[in-house]
Amino acid sequence: MHASVITHLRCPVCAGPLTAAGRALRCAAGHSFDIARQGYVDLTAGRSVHTGDSAEMVTAREALLEAGHFDVVSDAVAAAAAGVPGAGLIVEVGAGTGRYLARALGPDRVGLAVDVSKAALRRAARADPRIGAVRADVWQGLPVRDAAADVILDIFAPRSGPEFARVLRPGGVAVVVTPAPGHLAELVAALGMVGVDPAKPERLAASLRPWLTQVDEVPLRATLALDRAAAAALVGMGPSAWHTDPAAVTATLAGMPEPITATLEVRLSTWRSGG
């Protein structure tokens, strides 16, 4: 793990600073956390957490993102991060494969990929040499020192207003991407995917506004032209994977002419820490 990332980490047990000690991270109180051979560190400290995305979901997401279908999102996220002054740390919560984080680093920053999925962290740890990957649950507290981050990325991921405010430095910014009600509407109708809660914008504001100040919100929209494999990956990479039958999805897609079109429709909002 990159030394400059470790300097921003804190012990999940006692909140003391972590330092490298061979193939482990340790604090002064003696708490020790092994670095897995795949490059990530489990900092859940034995607490029970959700297992997160399965290996199949991560593979599907990696294929879809690498094909460039969500580049309109990654480009906008990278631009928003680049607009925040500083040459320090970017933290991505729910980082998945680390692709968004790697594209947002720019020339001068290091990144921390946080996820609960071990399958995702194996990918994130390899996404860029400047990225460190840790297993942690945002609801149980991020293993990051106070005021350590220039930017937090949260892309289709859980959020914690109090933790974001604690981890961001004064003037730091959280970049949040959430689906709009029309996101992938064509596939939702055809394949039984999970739809978007119309009240999602209100819930987002309620989760962040007491702790951060909203700076901006911009809509992002693109028409995706997918082959059947990409459409299946789109279903299989997110929450719909838990609610659909892969065989039924494959059968439905077999009867749909290519390219299969779907509308990517999301909102990107930025939230500043007042410090």
Put a short name on every predicted segment.
Residues G46, H50-A76:
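Class I SAM-dependent methyltransferase Rossmann-like catalytic core
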Residues G86-G96, V173-A205:
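Conserved class I S-adenosyl-L-methionine
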Residues T97-D108:
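Conserved SAM-binding loop of SAM-dependent methyltransferases across substrates and taxa
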Residues I6, V218-G275:
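Conserved Class I S-adenosyl-L-methionine
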Residues G161-V175:
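A short glycine-rich, Lys/Arg-flanked "PGG" loop and its adjoining helix->strand segment in the class I
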Residues D115-A119:
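Conserved SAM/SAH-binding beta-strand->alpha-helix loop
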Residues M1-T51:
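N-terminal auxiliary segments of SAM/dcSAM-dependent transferases
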